[in-house]
């Protein structure tokens, strides 16, 4: 059995889990997420203990790995509908600005035109200051994907460090060429 799948997923109060066929839906105070469970993974809902248990239907390596992956995905779903996920981005550079307007994030990144990024459903963006962006949502994968797409508009360059970076990212700097 996968070492990850051995640990059950604890369900916090206010989180409901339903399994209909292969479709697992997790409902919490922040919203609802669904996942199609792979046919080689068995999911057991233990109501008394308030937890989910995962097991591989047979013992081969790929099935055990799939059980661990499914457990990790469901754990992220439970955490997402109860607490949510957030990613912080920083804009470093002269004239780099961000402004959130509803479902559109307006970015000035040193191009000749402003960049308008349409946020997908379930994702919200805040701009506490002009150079900080907070991306929030219940789907961990989608929050990370949106943050990566925004960062890709202007990645941090190694000479001056200008660009869009994650708040916890360390940009490796290079020395300028000498004559």
UniProtKB/Swiss-Prot annotation:
Disulfide-bond pairs as recorded: none
Complex and partners: Part of the 50S ribosomal subunit.
Alphabetical keyword list: Ribonucleoprotein, Ribosomal protein, RNA-binding, rRNA-binding
A GO biological process held by the record: cytoplasmic translation
Function of the protein: This protein binds to the 23S rRNA, and is important in its secondary structure. It is located near the subunit interface in the base of the L7/L12 stalk, and near the tRNA binding site of the peptidyltransferase center.
Protein family membership: Belongs to the universal ribosomal protein uL6 family.
GO CC entries: cytosolic large ribosomal subunit
Classification lineage: Bacteria, Pseudomonadati, Pseudomonadota, Gammaproteobacteria, Pseudomonadales
Database matches in InterPro entries: Ribosomal_uL6-like, Ribosomal_uL6-like_a/b-dom_sf, Ribosomal_uL6_a/b-dom, Ribosomal_uL6_bac-type, Ribosomal_uL6_CS
Record-given protein name: Large ribosomal subunit protein uL6
One GO MF term attached to the UniProt entry: structural constituent of ribosome
